[in-house]
């Protein structure tokens, strides 16, 4: 369906690493997807296929914070980026940086809502709600 050469896959991995390296904090899957799709850096299917491969290669890592999966670049990913960043065309570097600068508030203002409902005695319930809105 989508033919992608080895050189294209390398470039697309570098673009993902470059994106991580220029974010002010770690991001969720949906935040990263938003950035990649809005900048037209690659097609959705290639991006979805590369993410697990990059986790497996330990270029990026995924961890949980407040029951939310977050992604970040690893030391190995940074080292690869330092050596090969010059392979990313200036057009993509500028487009990603411009998007991050101009949409920083949109990217990081997402709300994380978690709730849990527990039954208590006498048909009463205990509800726990966590609302976390990232801010500058």
Spans of features found by a protein language model:
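Exposed, interaction-prone assembly regions rather than primary DNA-binding/catalytic cores
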Residues: 94-136
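Short amphipathic alpha-helical interaction segments
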Residues: 41-56
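Residues at alpha-helix boundaries and the short loops/turns that link adjacent helices
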Residues: 22-26, 67
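Contiguous, well-ordered alpha-helical segments that form the cores/surfaces of helical PPI scaffolds
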Residues: 14-18, 34, 52-54
């Amino acid at each position: 369906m989508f033919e992608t050469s080895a050189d294209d896959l390398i470039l697309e991995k570098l673009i993902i690493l470059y994106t991580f390296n220029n974010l002010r904090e770690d991001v969720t899957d949906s935040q990263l997807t938003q950035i990649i799709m809005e900048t037209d850096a690659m097609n959705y299917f290639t991006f979805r296929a590369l993410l697990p491969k990059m986790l497996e290669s330990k270029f990026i890592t995924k961890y949980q914070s407040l029951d939310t999966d977050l992604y970040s670049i690893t030391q190995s990913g940074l080292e690869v980026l330092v050596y090969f960043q010059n392979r990313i065309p200036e057009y993509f570097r500028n487009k990603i940086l411009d998007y991050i600068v101009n949409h920083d508030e949109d990217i990081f203002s997402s709300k994380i809502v978690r709730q849990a409902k527990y039954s208590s005695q006498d048909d009463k319930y205990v509800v726990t709600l966590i609302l976390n809105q990232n801010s500058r």
